[in-house]
């Protein structure tokens, strides 16, 4: 892995004047529907088939667009209790086509979501280096804490703690405070990032 190239790709996206906190924000018109889906996914006994049907219904009701629908269907398929990664990959491909057809001002954000979903599949299949590339591309498209957290998790999974700590220190010195605060919060909550907790404020 060419870490210098990886760090360069990430750090080249730094521009505090142009910072747009997109990745962890959803369009207002989708928020209620996505909150409902998120709560169902966290339930102890969620029914994948019923939730898929509900997602499709929400799209027909106009509460989700096609991009968000396919994204949600991917998340259901990739859920550990479902673990249908072929379906998850198919939904990511459909999401990409829907994003390209829709275009518009959210195109980069929508494509970043596709990159994240593909990164999740690669990560779950044990291809951590490939997942790292997907997550890095997601961050290039959409500068937000969630995308950086995925990059750091991959570095840690690969055993590259020094590189992860170096990246975190560089990010802390270059990125807007709201992004680093959100990233610190994720580090304290996500067990995949636990090895970085000594690098964050208490």
Which residues does each PLM region occupy?
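Start-of-helix signal in alpha-solenoid helical-repeat scaffolds, especially tetratricopeptide repeats
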Residues: 3, 30, 48, 65-71, ...
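Alpha-helical adaptor scaffolds
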Residues: 70-140, 146, 157, 170-173
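Hydrophobic/aromatic side-chain positions at a characteristic register within alpha-helices
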Residues: 14, 41, 59, 80-81, ...
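TPR-repeat structural position
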Residues: 16-19, 45-48, 85-86, 128, ...
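Flexible helix-coil transition and linker loops at the boundaries of alpha-helical arrays
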Residues: 21-25, 48, 55-68, 83, ...
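"A position-specific structural signal for the A-helix of alpha-solenoid helical repeats
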Residues: 31, 35-38, 53, 70-75, ...
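Conserved positions within tetratricopeptide repeat
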Residues: 20-23, 48-52, 68, 89-90, ...
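TPR/TPR-like (Sel1-like) alpha-helical repeat modules
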Residues: 152-179
């Amino acid at each position: 892995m060419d870490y210098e190239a990886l760090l360069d790709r990430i750090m080249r996206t730094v521009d505090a004047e142009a910072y747009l906190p997109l990745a962890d924000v959803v369009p207002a018109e989708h928020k209620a529907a996505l909150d409902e889906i998120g709560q169902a996914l966290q339930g102890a006994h969620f029914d994948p088939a019923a939730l898929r049907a509900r997602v499709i219904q929400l799209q027909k009701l106009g509460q989700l667009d096609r991009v968000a629908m396919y994204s949600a269907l991917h998340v259901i398929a990739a859920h550990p209790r479902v673990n249908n990664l072929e379906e998850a990959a198919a939904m990511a491909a459909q999401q990409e086509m829907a994003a390209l057809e829709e275009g518009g001002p959210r195109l980069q954000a929508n494509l970043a979501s596709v990159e994240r979903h593909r990164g999740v599949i690669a990560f779950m299949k044990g291809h951590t280096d490939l997942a790292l590339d997907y997550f890095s591309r997601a961050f290039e498209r959409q500068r937000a804490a969630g995308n950086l957290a995925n990059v750091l998790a991959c570095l840690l999974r690969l055993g590259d703690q020094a590189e992860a700590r170096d990246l975190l220190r560089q990010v802390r010195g270059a990125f807007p405070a709201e992004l680093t605060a959100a990233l610190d919060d994720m580090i304290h909550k996500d067990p995949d990032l636990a090895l970085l907790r000594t690098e964050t404020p208490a």
